[in-house]
């Protein structure tokens, strides 16, 4: 349980859980880092030490193939009809979903890791910067909570026991100021009678990433 200034981030996670239907939510500083953490957990959970291949649409936000490569994988760009993508897509063969273009009531897909985004001018929930992981795996939830916070629990590091469920983590924690904004703005997604509102998936154009040499070293 979070204490002190960290409580507001936990409160925002509970609100996201209520709205999306996900049993657990882990907030991070941006959605790209959410994808990275899920991919890292995928390799740990499945004892993957060699290069693994992940399908990525050839038109998507550029950080997606970057995070696959950072996590030790290789990218298989898949063909996209047209110049846009709409809504969430799965990073097969994993159960990780890039859900940057989706945010709606009861959106959670069971047995998945759904990475949502609050960054940029197009998102339904605009927090300037931020992201979250929706999931229903308790072990993964515990690992991700510590992995996103430099291996820390949500308490003073002077009082932390770093050897309790140890994780070598990263500094991806969502700042309390952002979570506070999220707590205020998420109320717009409820009707006056308290029922949740449903939002249309976003559709955005992206460059054809498979045309660029940048990712060639990490492409299957």
Where are these regions (language model features)?
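Short, acidic/glycine-rich phosphate-metal binding loop used to engage nucleotide
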Residues: 22, 31-32, 79-82, 120-122
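Short alpha-helical
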Residues: 33, 62-63, 139
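Phosphate- and divalent-cation-binding pockets in alpha/beta enzyme and binding domains
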Residues: 37, 63, 143
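Active-site region of PLP-dependent enzymes
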Residues: 103-105, 109, 113-220
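PLP-dependent aminotransferase-like
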Residues: 40-107
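Phosphate-binding glycine-rich loop
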Residues: 10-54, 67-71
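Conserved N-terminal alpha-helix of the aminotransferase class I/II PLP-enzyme fold
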Residues: 1-33, 197-220
